[in-house]
Amino acid sequence: MLIRMISSISRWDGSRSVNRKDAFICGDAISDLRTTNNELRVWKADTQEDIEDAIVALALNRDSVSKLSYFLLEEDELKKIEIDVSDQKPGAAAGLKDCILSKHRDLIELDFWRLGFLTQYMLELVKNPKQCKNLTRKEIKALLEKYKNKNLITVEQMNSKLKEDLKW
């Protein structure tokens, strides 16, 4: 499995309406699939520990602790829609141990069609509460504290705004 952060599940679940009789998905959801160099960042997430590792990495790339939403993507399903996964670039999250950063992946060689197929796939996933989740600020903060206490985060290397928000 792979984990992909999104801005909000409400963009995907149909609760945000578009005043068109032919509306398919709210346009804001597409911004969750913004690529760089035709790639989309994801994290390896085969276990609950992997999921937590990814969430911590994503949280460490922010200026403050805030809610976080994500989808869990099945690699076999991505293969069916001809989306390839690369492990060539390590992840980046200031202060996080390399053993976690090595779980970073990229969906690569994305084009208009692959993004469309990925959108359709994610619209199916949103119907399954096991495949998508919203985490509260409190849950994110508790996870960051847990990783700090396990010495998996080097506080001195963290983003100063995030450290200030956490009062570390």
Residue ranges with predicted function:
Residues 1-41, 55, 166-168:
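ADP-ribose/NAD+-binding catalytic cleft of ART/PARP-like enzymes
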